[in-house]
A protein has these predicted regions:
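Bacterial N-terminal signal peptides
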Residues: 7-15
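Alpha-helical cap/lid subdomain in secreted, periplasmic
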Residues: 108, 246-385
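Extracellular and organelle-lumenal recognition/adhesion modules and their flexible linkers in secreted
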Residues: 390-529
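Extended, low-complexity, turn-rich repeat/linker tracts enriched in Gly/Pro/Ser/Thr and Asp/Glu
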Residues: 86-101, 145-146, 324, 447, ...
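N-terminal secretory targeting modules
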Residues: 9, 21-178, 183-201, 389-390
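Positively charged n-region of N-terminal signal peptides that target proteins for export
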Residues: 1-4
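Conserved SGNH/GDSL esterase-like catalytic core that processes O-acyl groups on lipids
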Residues: 69-71, 188, 194-288, 323-329, ...
Length: 529
């Protein structure tokens, strides 16, 4: 009330013509603000569904909402002059400092707090000022369930608004991601593969799962545990039955601090994305004659359980980012076939490219995680029947590498494709025409109006020019040439496509070049628009 009395005094002086018209305006403005300020209150809100949106699996006890899985979050709009959120720590604050939970607080999508939780309570200031404003707030667990969660205890706000706190709107699409360390973003911020795990370098906001959900404008829920598998956790070949996801899928969390069964009825998903099998590899591959069938059967059982809990969901299965695709993926394919559910599909993930860097303990780098988010969003679009924009996707990633030679013109050659999809071509006799020997990456789908970047690295022992063509059955979309040298050279060119093509190919024409060795690597055709 003191502010109002002072303002009224100033206004009285103005009415006696003691102050100028400009000062009279300023005094009125002060009076209005003073009245509003006196109507504002310091309020405290609990993080319950009436006030906030809770994303992902969570646990509630003593009015605290614990976010307990990678990416689990509390989101709300706050309208007021100032606001804080109070974060609680649980038993995990006593973990070794490398294994304490990490969380982030975002205001209008900007990270304002990134903290390893090491105390029982911590207050984060969201904003402070004299002018009322509305912001969107998110409190998210950045580390994984293995290392505990953090609790949102209360939201404190000074506000004059009738609705100071309200939930962020739900998205139209909801995706559940089930996985292991790859899904959790294990080591994604580590400088290299030689650094060991710690939660300070694990960041779910850089995981393919988070980025794919963001690209698809979807809500998400995560169930992922590092080192876990379908029938065995990570091992040197002996069975590790204590680290399997199917045994804990129906629980809120494996962590005993957050007991109870998950409420599937009120948390149905439109899509379930499963990325498991990497940690099973060492166990399964040691005795494939018997263990392949064991894996297939347990995967069938897991799909059956997921379908029971999510009757209408589309389910997409994959494995392979950290290897194991050749050994484990066929088993997943077989399990999907045995279940016979038309809403379940699968694909083999491309193994990470070492040239894109590595995170802790040889885990995917930020580049690899980002690229896989484009792949995952594209696969989800295909599964649910909506058009994918394919932006960010390397449409040549699954292309078939092969060569053609015109033996009638005397052309001869050999080729080899490396595990990293490097392409080695050695000509004997080059033939008579430039088209007599062609190295091809085929089976590429192109979209009309799409803008793509064609990239690759090349080298040869001879200096010459090699034609490079992007063509379909009846149309050449692009034509250029590269000058070869003994030094590895990077090529990059932007291409706009004028019409759809479901079976295009990248072609390198090596005809007429006798005894010519040509090496290609990192061939990519990435859609950028």
């Amino acid at each position: 009330m003191k502010n109002i009395y002072l303002s009224l005094l100033f206004l009285s002086l103005c009415t006696l013509n003691i102050c100028s018209p400009r000062n009279k305006f300023l005094f009125l403005n002060v009076l209005n603000k003073a009245v509003l300020a006196d109507n504002c209150k310091d309020l405290t809100f609990l993080p319950i569904k009436e006030n906030v949106k809770i994303m992902g699996r969570y646990y509630q006890k003593n009015d605290i909402t614990w976010v307990v899985h990678s990416g689990s979050a509390v989101e709300f709009y706050a309208t007021g002059n100032s606001a804080q959120v109070v974060i609680a720590g649980g038993n995990s604050i006593y973990n070794d400092e490398r294994y304490r939970p990490r969380f982030g607080v975002y205001v209008d999508d900007k990270l304002v707090e990134d903290k390893i939780m090491d105390q029982l309570e911590h207050t984060v200031e969201l904003f402070k000022g004299t002018t009322e404003k509305t912001v969107k707030v998110k409190v998210m667990l950045l580390s994984e369930a293995n290392n505990g969660g953090v609790g949102v205890k209360s939201i404190n706000i000074n506000s004059c608004n009738e609705t100071p706190i309200k939930p962020v709107e739900k998205k139209k699409l909801r995706i559940e991601f089930i996985g292991d360390s790859i899904t959790a973003g294990y080591g994604v911020e580590a400088p290299n593969q030689y650094e060991n795990f710690k939660t300070s370098t694990e960041n779910f906001s850089m995981s393919y799962a988070y980025l794919a959900a963001k690209k698809l404008d979807a809500d998400y829920s995560i169930v992922c545990y590092s080192g876990h598998g379908i029938i065995s956790g990570y091992s040197t070949g002996d069975k590790n039955p204590d680290q399997v996801v199917p045994d804990v899928y129906t629980k809120i969390s494996k962590n005993e601090e957050y007991p109870g069964e998950w409420d599937f009825e009120n948390n149905q998903n439109d899509v379930i994305f499963i990325n498991l099998g990497t940690n099973d590899l060492n166990y399964v591959s040691k005795e494939p004659a018997t263990r392949n069938d064991e894996f297939i059967q347990e995967y069938v059982n897991f799909l059956t359980l997921i379908r029971e809990k999510n009757p209408q969901s589309y389910i997409v299965c994959t494995v392979g980012i950290m290897g194991g695709g050749d050994e484990i993926y066929p088993l997943i394919e077989k399990a999907v076939e045995l279940v016979g559910d038309k809403k379940i599909s699968s694909y083999k993930s491309q193994t990470q490219n070492m040239n894109d860097g590595l995170g802790a303990d040889w885990h995917p780098s930020k580049i690899t995680q980002t690229y896989n988010s484009y792949v995952v969003s594209d696969k989800i679009c295909n599964a649910i029947g909506i058009e994918s924009d394919q932006v960010g996707l390397d449409v040549a990633a699954d292309s078939v590498y092969d060569v053609s030679k015109n033996e009638a013109n005397g052309a001869s050659m050999s080729f080899w494709v490396g595990y990293d999809k490097s392409f080695w071509i050695n000509t004997g006799m080059g033939g008579k025409e430039v088209t007599d020997i062609e190295a091809k990456c085929s089976g590429i789908k192109l979209k009309k109006g799409g803008v793509y970047i064609l990239e690759f690295e090349h080298n040869s022992y001879k200096e010459t020019e090699v034609p490079v063509i992007l063509r379909g059955k009846d149309k050449v979309h692009f034509k250029d040439s590269v000058k070869t040298s003994n030094n590895k050279t990077k090529y990059s060119k932007e291409i706009t496509i004028e019409e759809n093509d479901d079976n295009a190919e990248i072609v390198y024409q090596l005809g007429t070049l006798d005894s010519f060795q040509f090496t290609l690597s990192n061939i990519k055709l990435t859609k950028i628009k």
